[in-house]
Amino acid sequence: VVTNPKKAAAALSWAVDEMENRYKLMSKVGVRNITGFNVKMDTEREEYEMKLKQWEHDNKNSVKSDEIESEEESDKPTEPPEKLPYILIVIDELADLMMVASKGGEEALTRLAQMARASGIHLIVATQRPSVDVLTGIIKANFPSRISYKVTSRVDSRTILDSMGAEKLLGKGDMLFMPPGTHRLLRIHGAMVSDEEIQKIISFIKEQKKPTYKDQIFEVAVTDKGKTKEAEDYDERYD
């Protein structure tokens, strides 16, 4: 969980790098998406374990010189990459991120929205201030699926859905949903989830596996020019 908007921008930059690395891995094994990659890794893992057992059996209880041992080590089967996990990125308030890092944040969001789905990285973006400087045209164009709760004006409704109607909703979970691939709006109702239920869900998720934290997510990335991204955004006269 990232609460500092500046660190959130760094986390988005990490997500872009992770997406690019995943595409390189998928390109090497000749698959188009994360599903194909994980299926192929399962197959290669089974083949690797069979080859490893055969290799260990062939070299068991044998006394050989260092030179022969080094040659046999080179014949040892190569372990395939691990399967790729799915990543869900949830931005609770886009307005805060856009105020702190509008340029870098918009670029990262756009790239992730355009390409990240096939690599197993998905985005949920929310805001309580649906203005055009927060939900820019570039961001909206790359988020085909949208939801709007009750808003105060027609302008806000058009900003989110490109259509009026959200200003007439009843509130308390009443919403309009735009499915991907269509501009037809569906009126649906969200479920009320209490704090107690949220804690139960979190506890259930924690029971599945212990969290693995990656400290490198917040490391300052270095650009091709040798400057850090943070330094590029720094304006001496303004700051």
Protein language model features and the residues they cover:
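Conserved nucleotide-sensing/catalytic segment adjacent to the nucleotide-binding pocket
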Residues: V2-V16
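P-loop NTPase motor-domain active sites and their immediate coupling elements
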Residues: S13, D17-D239
